[in-house]
Amino acid sequence: MACLGFQRHKAQLNLATRTWPCTLLFFLLFIPVFCKAMHVAQPAVVLASSRGIASFVCEYASPGKATEVRVTVLRQADSQVTEVCAATYMMGNELTFLDDSICTGTSSGNQVNLTIQGLRAMDTGLYICKVELMYPPPYYLGIGNGTQIYVIDPEPCPDSDFLLWILAAVSSGLFFYSFLLTAVSLSKMLKKRSPLTTGVYVKMPPTEPECEKQFQPYFIPIN
């Protein structure tokens, strides 16, 4: 019985091995029928703001009138590709991402305006826009060439306490300098006045007034 079970398992493996090339050939032949390529354009380079916000536009050439669209933002760093955010929306409705997503966006016709927030220098990389026209059939898929987003971390602001200490030290230095300058000036003024005064008061006798000159008045007769 064990030998019979082993033979059945071996036969199933052989059957799966034989049908695998047929399955692969089926997908290669019929996937292009259900999935059609679509051109997606996006800017080549974007510089994030000092607050870590980067915005760019994804524009796709829609061959038909799609009513359901899915937008996905992929990040490629070195050889790794990770999904940043994704959203599915109906044409004419607002583009809404998840509440915890770092992405926001709006749609207008065949354009999707994307904004990525909370970026840091370590998030610098190639951000690829992937657009899928989900409904109605046929299914269209378009992948852009990517937007290189550069993020520069702002320089940290100096500590406010440290600035207060510097201000206090400068103020103290200026006060001490002004006090020293005033003391030196007063000392020089006192040294200049010391030779003029002995510091002893002597009562001097009053001087006799000069004799007043006697003038004889005279009259001029008038005829």
From Swiss-Prot:
Protein name in UniProt: Cytotoxic T-lymphocyte protein 4
Extracellular side stretches: 36-161
Effect ascribed to mutating R70 to A/D: Strongly reduced interaction with CD80, CD86 and ICOSLG
Segments on the Cytoplasmic side according to the record's topology features: 183-223
Residue segments, region Homodimerization: 46-50, 150-155
Disulphide bonds in the chain: C58-C129, C85-C103
Note: The therapeutic antibody Ipilimumab competes for the binding site of the endogenous ligands CD80/B7-1, CD86/B7-2 and ICOSLG.
Phosphotyrosine PTM positions: Y201
Source organism per UniProt: Homo sapiens
Signal sequence extent: 1-35
Glycan attachment residues as annotated in the record: N113, N145
Effect of S49A: Strongly reduced interaction with CD80, CD86 and ICOSLG
Keyword annotations of the record: Adaptive immunity, Cell membrane, Diabetes mellitus, Disease variant, Disulfide bond, Glycoprotein, Immunity, Immunoglobulin domain, Membrane, Pharmaceutical, Phosphoprotein, Signal, Systemic lupus erythematosus, Transmembrane, Transmembrane helix
